[in-house]
Amino acid sequence: MAVPARHTSKQKKRSRRGHIKLSVPAMHYDATTGEYRLSHRVSPKGYYKGRQVVNNNDNGNN
């Protein structure tokens, strides 16, 4: 089984992982609902690209 010849120090390990970061989610202002929402997603009110694509009139009972 292969093992490292030298112990990897904290500095070496952290500098290697320094470029790994969380990205900011892509959000934009939706003029139809007047709220910010994630890009390429349907708004909570059911609008996408200015059109209503999901009907939210039902109360969740099937």
Curated annotation (Swiss-Prot):
Residues 1-20 are annotated as: Disordered. One of its GO terms (molecular function) is structural constituent of ribosome. One of its GO terms (cellular component) is large ribosomal subunit. Keywords: Ribonucleoprotein, Ribosomal protein. It comes from the Bacteria. InterPro entries: Ribosomal_bL32, Ribosomal_bL32_bact, Ribosomal_zn-bd. Residues 7-20 have a biased composition (Basic residues). One of its GO terms (biological process) is translation. Belongs to the bacterial ribosomal protein bL32 family. NCBIfam families: rpmF_bact. This is Large ribosomal subunit protein bL32. The gene is rpmF.
